[in-house]
Curated annotation (Swiss-Prot):
Top-level taxon: Bacteria
Record: active site: 134 (proton donor/acceptor), 162 (schiff-base intermediate with substrate)
Gene3D superfamilies for the chain: Aldolase class I
Family statement: Belongs to the DapA family.
Chemical reaction(s) catalysed: L-aspartate 4-semialdehyde + pyruvate = (2S,4S)-4-hydroxy-2,3,4,5-tetrahydrodipicolinate + H2O + H(+)
First-level EC class: lyase
Listed EC numbers: 4.3.3.7
Coiled coil: none
Pathway: Amino-acid biosynthesis; L-lysine biosynthesis via DAP pathway; (S)-tetrahydrodipicolinate from L-aspartate: step 3/4
A Pfam family assignment: DHDPS
The protein, known as: 4-hydroxy-tetrahydrodipicolinate synthase
């Protein structure tokens, strides 16, 4: 299974009381299809996976696959800090028809490199579902080394990685050393253009939640080696990329979507609304690219 381009790390819409808003979820999927987004990544970090129950997590995957209806590929967030839970989620994603699973480095329990390797190998061996690794040490604390990634790249069923460290030098080394066919994706909007120009297949993007067409165009230009166009689009999105991380993701991007009228403004504790001091900053960034 090959993926490329702009893959949106989709938010999970909620009502102000924290209940899941499946109507808005389906509407967002339709919008991304219309705007040219190349793939959906659901119930990951941006989708607030730690804040939903296992049953809700499974239903969000099922609804996304059902509503996408083959119009756009769906990568299901199947990560957990329990290997058994990760296997359970991956089996469900496979059963309902997701094209792949995104599996994050186990968080909080801080496994060493051998533990990380065995965790992902166990998931891949248990479920016949293409797996995209996800390294985001700023959220997980444990950091999967390039050496561990390269070991895992040899495991059947592990097809790629979302490289969300934001370290271009590290990503460049991984691109140079990874086996042919191993798919590297940026997971960091501010540095995505650079990594794609170096050979990454695309970007698993937070910014694409609010600027899907622009992010699709950026990824297309970078993949095609059009440096002037890539620089132009990257400069246009730079302020927005920064603003959407002014507080912990997905606080700013959910606030932005509510301002744009796509969703209600809802979170689940411990996530709360964007601090008022940042409202004008995010609003200005949206206005600058014509989204408000």
């Amino acid at each position: 299974m090959q993926f490329q381009g702009s893959l949106v790390a989709l938010v999970t819409p909620m009502q102000p009381d924290g209940s899941l808003d499946y109507d808005a979820y389906r509407s967002l999927i339709d919008w991304h299809v219309a705007e040219g987004t190349d793939g959906l990544v659901v119930v990951g970090t941006t989708g607030e996976s730690p804040s939903v129950s296992m049953e809700e997590h499974a239903e969000l995957i099922r609804v996304a696959v059902e509503h996408a209806a083959g119009r756009i590929p769906v990568i299901a967030g199947v990560g957990a800090n329990s290997t058994d839970e990760a296997i359970h989620l991956a089996r469900h994603a496979k059963a309902v028809g997701a094209q792949a699973g995104l599996s994050v480095v186990p968080y909080y329990n801080k496994p060493n490199q051998e533990g990380i390797y065995r965790h992902f190998r166990a998931v891949a061996e248990a479920v016949d579902l293409p797996t995209v690794l996800y390294n985001v040490p700023g959220r997980t604390v444990a950091d999967m080394s390039n050496d561990t990634v390269l070991r895992l790249a040899e495991v059947p069923g592990i097809i790629g990685i979302k490289e969300a460290t934001g370290d271009i030098a590290r990503g460049a080394l991984l691109l140079r050393e990874a086996p042919a066919g191993f798919q590297v994706f940026s997971g960091d909007d501010p540095t995505a253009a650079a990594l794609i120009l170096l050979g990454a297949r695309g970007n698993i993007s937070v910014t694409a939640n609010v600027a899907p067409r622009l992010m699709h165009e950026l990824c297309t230009a970078a993949r095609g080696g059009d440096v002037p166009r890539t620089r132009e689009l990257n400069a246009r999105l730079a302020r927005l990329n920064k603003a959407l991380f002014i507080e912990a993701n997905p606080i700013p991007v959910k606030w932005a979507l509510a301002q744009m009228g796509h969703t209600a403004l809802g979170y689940r504790l411990p996530m709360v609304e964007l601090s008022e001091q940042y409202h004008s900053l995010v609003r200005t960034a949206l206005q600058e690219v014509g989204l408000l």
